[in-house]
Amino acid sequence: NTLNAKRCDVIIGTNTTYDALDTTKPYYRAGHVWIYREDSGYDISSWDSPDLKKAVIGLVDKSPVTQALSRNGLMANAKPYRIQRDLTKSPGEPVEDVVSGKIDVAIMWGPLGGYYAKQSDVDLVVVEIPEYAEGNSRLQGKTYWNISAGVRKREVERREMVEGAIFRNLDKIYAIMDEYGIPHTEPIFVDRLDGYKRHKK
């Protein structure tokens, strides 16, 4: 709405396949992460981790990872957060609760969780949930997306200008993301869970 009202001209950090926008080629790919205290002794690298089975797990209500929790018998461990529906809540509340000990593990959208974990005074571990590893197949649901910048439909010249600026400065962009704790991986161009291509390399 803000874009179409011409209150801004570019939206950064949007899903590459978002049809309401004309998006640039993706410049990174992001997914969900597990976050836990370093002093917890946890070692989580897959949905089969014994540590997940004994943990209180916080996640945003109706998050895409809910399907994975259900498939792995972890819903009884889950504590939902209604952050998206309550503007009085901090987006970093699950991380704050990991720090305070209210929950053991937070599952969050990587760019959001990584940022808040980086700000913490307590040492936290941020682990990217494997995208296509065993145990995170189609049955687990889609938890990763290519990320682009977007402009209004039919503004081809503006899109090309923004795209050029992004890719000329990609190393600087990645350095800033690293500084703020934002996990990122290389975009992929055939996503079997999307079922189609949006951009070619």
Predicted regions and their residues:
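Ligand-binding clefts/hinges and TM-proximal coupling segments of bilobed small-molecule sensing domains
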Residues: 64-85, 160-201
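Ligand-binding "clamshell"
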Residues: 15-30, 115-153
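Solvent-exposed loop/turn segments at secondary-structure junctions
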Residues: 10, 15-20, 40-42, 62-67, ...
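Extended ligand-binding regions for polar small-molecule ligands
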Residues: 39-41, 47-65, 137-184
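Alpha-to-beta junction loops
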Residues: 3-13, 54-56, 94, 98-108, ...
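Extracytoplasmic small-molecule ligand-binding "clamshell" domains
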Residues: 1-19, 87-88, 180
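Sec-exported extracytoplasmic/periplasmic mature domains
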Residues: 4, 8, 39-40, 70-74, ...
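Bilobed "Venus flytrap"/periplasmic-binding protein-like clamshell domains
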Residues: 33-90, 111-112
